[in-house]
Amino acid sequence: MSKSKEEALIQCAIAAHLGEKNIMIPNVSFARTSCRVPKHGNNGQLIGHEYPLRGVRHEADLIWINENDYLTEIEIKVSYSDFLADFKKEEKHLTKYTRAVYYAFPWDMYKENEEKIKKVLVEKFPEAGVIIVGMGGLAVSVIKNVEYFNAEKIPIEVKIGLMRIGCQKWWRWNA
């Protein structure tokens, strides 16, 4: 579940805006068991699991898998202090499958802190893009494009694992 109703509203607004040809999944923990791939022996019997995201420990507020099987992470920040706290964490928002990272903000919070946010991003994460959501979640705008990372396409087994997580979460959201 989202940390706040405002975060959930932003997740849904972005998903509605981008979701037509994309897979949008909220609150994905990249911990070891969140995305495991079954391994089968020659006779088809399950012999264990592989963990393609082993060692990754962060949680993404929203992930977006495009129709070409590239993953973009969207970090939703509803306060300036939450945004700053992101840069104090050891774990960064990157996996071998992460092609891009956006920060999403409510319009009013972004406008109030725009220059400070821009300065932090230039210094700490210049590749990140910026999305703002305003008017009760009805308006979604990309105001800074991302710089893409050299990333692997998501293998079908990992994509299915992430979609399973999404199916377990979206139905819980209520506005």
Where are each of the predicted segments found?
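Intrinsically disordered, low-complexity segments enriched in small/polar residues
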Residues: 49, 100-101, 146
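Non-catalytic C-terminal interaction segments of nucleic acid-processing enzymes
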Residues: 1-26, 33-36, 117-175
